[in-house]
């Protein structure tokens, strides 16, 4: 074990293997003239960010090209031996449609708030699914019980769900390196639900900023209908943690670079070249989200409004080539070059160009020198996940205390409070901010720079990586502890059922026998379910009861002719299997409270579009399933507060709020049934749904009790079924 292994375990408490999954491996491959393959480590943001974690570490990703079957064995051995990497071999078609088609043609523009640029079709979606399938198969093949799987970015949003299907105990985390858009933007995506369900199969989901996490949580509520908390989502029978982890850089790399002779000589050359001139630096990929046209328009406005800067200010704009084969990027390049030409033509002269435009990649030494000699950095992204250029600029400003002018639409803006914040769409504001930043007093420059430097040197790439792994390890351990509710072994229960002498089966209705329906009247039992109950009820050794919030009339019609017991309006009324008559649990009940409740329910129904209420003999139920999920929940909480002040029993259901007299207990009748059945040899009780009885409540019963939760509801000491379909399967058996 090396020093970095100890670092990972000491910092995170995790001693197993970490499997990192990203679209591309951090390695480029090349076939040499002798026919042998060679590999070379590549650079990149994720490579740098994960460098502090390099320990018992496996990286899974695409190799970047289609590889012939005959070469795959050699490449796999080479990558594993030298780099602990495992390649995923995709066909050229799948790779292109997955990466260029769906990931960058659909998800990238949508997540950066440009839904008009979507180019969606089923063909590229199918390739996205196929690529995620192939990645998950590679991970599943190498996965061991104590491993952590860390999935990266928008290319792999289906992988967690697919991997969970193959390996149910997998401990998976997901981190999104780009913004997550508001739910109003995200819902444009045709496959929006599949994407959300894909990453919800994680223990931990990470974002750069609180805004991105909040947008994700709202999408889970609005699109999937899930209940959320500020730090996570209730999904199936567990809590998926959602956290904020702003990524950083490796400052030491830049500090060391600044000390080299090569960089110092270059700094000296650049200072001599721009002596007497203020220098602005812009380093961006040539991408429409980076706001380079907006930056150039602001520079043009600066020269118009403050002509004194002519001849005294230059912008060095590096535009790193990106996706040059895509038409939109070609148009962007043309637009940028035309703006550069126009500004240099209007405000330049012989020997002076206000904009030095470089359409090329710049090596790290040159980049460090450019950062160092600049008086200010200008970042005008119209939407950016984080933007690490801002942090790189800060650590290279060792003497100058340069000013960081930063778009408020970057993720970095939420962390770098010492920057001058701008709205890149407000050309006037950006021009003024440049002017004021270049004239900022030295004391203020130093104060802002020290604030920024303190943050960047603390929140490094290593800090980010170790922090995420630590939280993932903790979240997956908590998930393991939470899963105390056993999945019901249906075959085992059926065997116990067959061996028992007398059984009592008690079912809830909505959400247990039938899925919740936006229109309650449409939740009729299927003919198959009715047939199953008819068969069960004709067995002299079996008693069946259904507990429901429905009224007597509805239940009588639905289960007409079937000899089962029924409880209506959450226990207000009760009917024995052999009877057609309903009994009122509490005779001569005072219902004067209904006159107070009726106007209150009407008031909240009018205030909450999509909601409605039902008035039954002894029960009011307010339904808000069809309301906006967030607003509906807020209104339900407020209504609950009003009801808490009244001497009534409030029943909180799934998107419902019910009210009845406080002296009614739906289990009272059932306990009487159980007590009456015990002398007849009762030795098995199944309670399925949200009604549960602890054995201690039945001191004279010494048989078996199965409390079975359905769906997301979890009760201690109970078993669990996922949905009504599994309940129906149990009944049929």
From Swiss-Prot:
Keywords, comma-separated and alphabetical: Carbohydrate metabolism, Glycosyltransferase, Transferase
Record function comment: Synthesizes trehalose 6-phosphate, the precursor for the production of trehalose, the main carbohydrate storage reserve of the dormant spore. Trehalose accumulates in both prestalk and prespore cells and then is rapidly metabolized during terminal differentiation of stalk cells, while being stored in spores, where it serves as the principal energy and carbon source for germination.
Keyword Glycosyltransferase: yes
Name assigned to this protein: Alpha,alpha-trehalose-phosphate synthase [UDP-forming] A
Catalytic activity from the UniProt record: D-glucose 6-phosphate + UDP-alpha-D-glucose = alpha,alpha-trehalose 6-phosphate + UDP + H(+)
First-level EC class: transferase
Gene Ontology molecular function: any one: alpha,alpha-trehalose-phosphate synthase (UDP-forming) activity
Database matches in CDD domains: GT20_TPS, HAD_TPP
EC number(s) on file: 2.4.1.15
Top-rank lineage group of the source organism: Eukaryota
Family according to the record: In the N-terminal section; belongs to the glycosyltransferase 20 family. In the C-terminal section; belongs to the trehalose phosphatase family.
Gene: tpsA
GO aspect biological process, one term: trehalose biosynthetic process
């Amino acid at each position: 074990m090396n020093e970095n292994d100890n670092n990972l375990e000491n910092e995170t408490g995790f001693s197993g293997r970490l499997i990192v999954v990203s679209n591309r491996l951090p390695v480029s491959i090349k076939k040499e003239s002798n026919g042998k393959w060679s590999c070379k480590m590549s650079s990149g943001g994720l490579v740098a960010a994960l460098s502090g974690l390099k320990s018992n570490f496996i990286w899974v990703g695409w190799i970047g090209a289609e590889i012939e079957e005959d070469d795959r064995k050699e490449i796999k051995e080479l990558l594993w031996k030298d780099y602990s990497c495992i390649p995923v071999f995709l066909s050229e078609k799948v790779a292109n449609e997955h990466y260029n088609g769906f990931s960058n043609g659909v998800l990238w523009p949508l997540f950066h708030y440009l839904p008009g640029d979507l180019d969606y079709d089923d063909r590229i979606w199918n390739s996205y699914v196929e690529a995620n399938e192939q990645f998950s198969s590679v991970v599943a093949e190498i996965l061991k019980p104590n491993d952590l799987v860390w999935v990266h970015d928008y290319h792999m949003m289906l992988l967690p769900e697919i991997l969970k299907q193959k390996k149910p105990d997998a401990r998976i985390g997901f981190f999104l390196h780009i913004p997550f858009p508001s739910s109003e933007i995200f819902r444009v995506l045709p496959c929006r639900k599949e994407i959300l369900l894909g990453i919800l199969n994680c223990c931990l989901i990470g974002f750069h900023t609180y805004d991105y996490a909040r947008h994700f949580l709202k999408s889970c509520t609005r699109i999937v209908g899930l209940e959320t908390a500020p730090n996570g989502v209730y999904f199936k029978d567990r809590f998926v943690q959602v956290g904020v982890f702003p990524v950083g850089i490796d400052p030491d790399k830049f500090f060391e670079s600044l000390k080299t002779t090569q960089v110092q000589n270059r700094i000296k050359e650049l200072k001599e070249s721009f002596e007497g001139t203020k220098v602005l630096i812009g380093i961006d990929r040539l991408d429409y989200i980076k706001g380079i046209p907006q930056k150039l328009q602001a520079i043009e406005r600066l020269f118009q409004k403050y002509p004194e800067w002519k001849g005294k200010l230059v912008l060095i704009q590096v535009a790193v080539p990106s996706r040059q084969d895509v038409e939109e990027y070609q148009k962007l390049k043309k637009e940028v070059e035309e703006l550069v030409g126009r500004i240099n033509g209007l405000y330049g002269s012989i020997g002076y160009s206000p904009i030095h435009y470089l359409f090329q990649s710049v090596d790290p030494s040159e980049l460090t020198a450019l950062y160092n000699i600049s008086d200010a950095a200008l970042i005008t992204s119209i939407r950016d996940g984080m933007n690490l250029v801002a942090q790189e600029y800060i650590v290279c400003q060792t003497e100058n205390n340069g000013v960081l002018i930063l778009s408020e639409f970057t993720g970095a803006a939420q962390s770098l409070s010492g920057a001058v914040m701008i709205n890149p769409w407000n050309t006037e504001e950006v021009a003024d901010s440049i002017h004021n930043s270049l004239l900022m007093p030295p004391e203020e420059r130093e104060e802002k720079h020290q604030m920024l430097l303190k943050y960047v040197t603390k929140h490094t790439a290593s800090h980010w990586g170790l922090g995420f792994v630590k939280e993932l390890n903790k979240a997956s351990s908590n998930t393991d502890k939470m899963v105390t509710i056993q999945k019901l072994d249906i075959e085992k229960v059926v065997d116990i059922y067959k061996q028992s002498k007398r059984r009592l089966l008690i079912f809830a209705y909505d959400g247990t026998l039938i899925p919740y329906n936006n229109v309650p009247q449409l939740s009729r039992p299927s003919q198959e379910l009715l047939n199953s109950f008819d068969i069960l009820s004709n067995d002299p050794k079996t008693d069946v009861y259904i507990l429901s919030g429905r009224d007597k009339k509805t239940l009588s019609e639905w289960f007409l002719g079937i000899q089962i017991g029924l409880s209506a309006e959450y226990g207000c009324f009760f009917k024995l299997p052999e009877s057609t008559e309903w009994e009122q649990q509490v005779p001569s009940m005072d219902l004067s409270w209904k006159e107070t409740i009726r106007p209150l329910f009407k008031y909240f129904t009018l205030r909450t579009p999509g909601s409605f209420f039902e008035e039954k003999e002894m029960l009011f139920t307010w339904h808000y399933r069809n309301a906006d999920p967030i607003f509906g929940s807020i209104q339900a909480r407020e209504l609950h507060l009003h009801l808490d002040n009244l001497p009534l029993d409030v029943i909180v259901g799934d998107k419902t709020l019910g009210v009845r007299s406080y002296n009614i207990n739906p289990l009272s009748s059932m306990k009487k049934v159980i007590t009456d059945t015990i002398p007849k040899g009762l030795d098995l009780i199944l309670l399925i749904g949200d009604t549960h009885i602890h054995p201690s409540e039945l001191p004279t019963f010494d048989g078996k009790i199965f409390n079975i939760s359905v769906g997301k509801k979890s009760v201690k000491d109970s078993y669990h079924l996922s949905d009504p379909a599994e309940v129906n399967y149990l009944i049929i058996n």
